[in-house]
Amino acid sequence: MVKFTFFVHCKGWKDGGYENTHYAETNQDAERIVANWNAEGRLPVTLLSITPISNAEFARDYIY
């Protein structure tokens, strides 16, 4: 399990967009998710980091 952080570019936002976090099974899945978002013509997304996490950490993050 990995946690990945990405930046969504929005021209109307003061800082040019916002940072968000999502989860995936593997690094490749995280990269594919971001690539799919960009291919769908949504707001541009830049992958910032991918961090391996334990199932327990995922559960803590997801619940809170």
Residues of each region from the PLM?
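Compositionally biased, low-structure terminal segments
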Residues: T5-V8, A24, A59
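A short, exposed loop/beta-hairpin motif centered on an aromatic-Gly-Thr core
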Residues: D15-Q28
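Short, mixed-charge low-complexity intrinsically disordered segments
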Residues: N36-Y64
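Compositionally biased, low-complexity intrinsically disordered regions
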Residues: K3, Q28, V45-L48
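Generic structural motif
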Residues: H9-W13, N27, I50-N55
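Short aromatic-glycine-(Arg/Gly/Cys) micro-motifs in beta-strand/loop hairpins
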Residues: M1-Y18
